[in-house]
A protein has these predicted regions:
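Fe(II)/2-oxoglutarate oxygenase catalytic core
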Residues: 1-192, 196-221
Length: 221
C-alpha cells in the first residue's frame, strides 16, 4: 500500500525571490497587489489541487457558483508574507488590526481552490466578499502557461439598484458596471486586494473547456 502524505512547510513554501507590483484601478484608486513567482514549488501546490476531488457541496462552495476544493492543512507558515505585504501596501487598514490577527487567520485557513469551466456560465455580476473594508482576499493562479486565460477583473458600480438581477455572466463594462482593470492569469501569480472591491473571475466562453479547468487558490483574510 502507498499512502500519500504532505509536508506543508515544503509544499506551501514562499519563494524568497518573488516579484511585487501594485496596480490602482478606478476613481477610488482601488489598490491591487500582484506578486509573481509566489510559491517556491508551485507545481506541488497545483498537483495537490488536482489530486483532491472538487465538490459542489454547498457547505464547501458557499455562494461560489463553481466547484471547490476545501481541505485542512497547516498553513500557518504562509502568514508572514501576507502580514508583510498588507502592512507595506495597506498600512491604514493593518493599523486597525489587533496584534497577531494575521497569524490567527492563517491558523484557521484552509486549502481552498475554486474549479470552474467556461461553458454554461451562470448569470453572475461582480461581487464584494465583505463590505467592511477591513478584510483582504487573495487569489493564486494554478493554471500552467498553456492553460492560462482571463484573470481577475475589477469594477465600479454606476447603476441605481445593485441588487437587480442580471441575465448573463458580467465581464465587460455595461450600463451598470464599469470594468476598471484586470489582472491577467499567470501561473504562480498571487493577487491581493480588499474584500470590499467589486470583482469577478474574468471568464468567457471557450477559455476553459474539455479537460481544462480554471484553478485558483483562494484566501479570505
Amino acid at each position: 500500500m502507498k499512502k500519500n502524505q504532505i509536508n506543508e512547510d515544503e509544499v506551501f513554501l514562499i519563494n524568497p525571490d518573488y516579484f511585487v507590483k501594485v496596480e490602482t484601478f478606478g476613481s477610488n484608486n482601488d489598490k491591487v497587489v500582484v506578486v509573481d513567482d509566489f510559491y517556491a514549488y508551485p507545481d506541488k501546490v497545483r498537483q495537490l489541487a488536482l489530486d483532491i476531488p472538487a465538490s459542489k457541496n454547498q457547505r464547501i462552495r458557499g455562494g461560489n457558483p463553481a466547484w471547490r476544493v476545501n481541505a485542512f492543512y497547516v498553513l500557518d507558515g504562509m502568514a508572514w508574507i501576507f502580514d508583510q505585504l498588507c502592512n507595506q501596501y495597506f498600512p491604514e487598514i493593518m493599523a486597525q488590526w489587533p496584534a497577531g490577527a494575521m497569524e490567527d487567520s492563517f491558523k484557521r485557513a484552509t486549502f481552498m481552490v475554486n474549479v470552474m469551466q467556461s461553458e454554461n456560465l451562470p448569470a453572475v455580476k461582480p461581487h464584494m466578499d465583505n463590505p467592511s473594508g477591513l478584510h483582504f482576499a487573495s487569489t493564486i493562479y494554478l493554471n500552467n502557461e498553456n492553460e492560462s486565460n482571463g484573470g481577475t477583473s475589477f469594477y465600479e458600480y454606476v447603476g441605481t439598484n445593485v441588487n437587480e438581477p442580471v441575465s448573463s455572466y458580467i465581464t465587460e463594462s455595461t450600463n451598470d458596471w464599469t470594468m476598471t482593470g484586470m489582472v491577467p492569469m499567470k501561473f504562480n501569480r498571487m493577487v491581493l486586494y480588499l474584500q470590499n472591491v467589486w470583482h469577478t473571475a474574468y471568464v468567457k466562453p471557450g477559455m476553459f473547456t474539455n479537460d481544462v479547468y480554471r484553478l485558483n487558490q483562494q484566501f479570505f483574510i
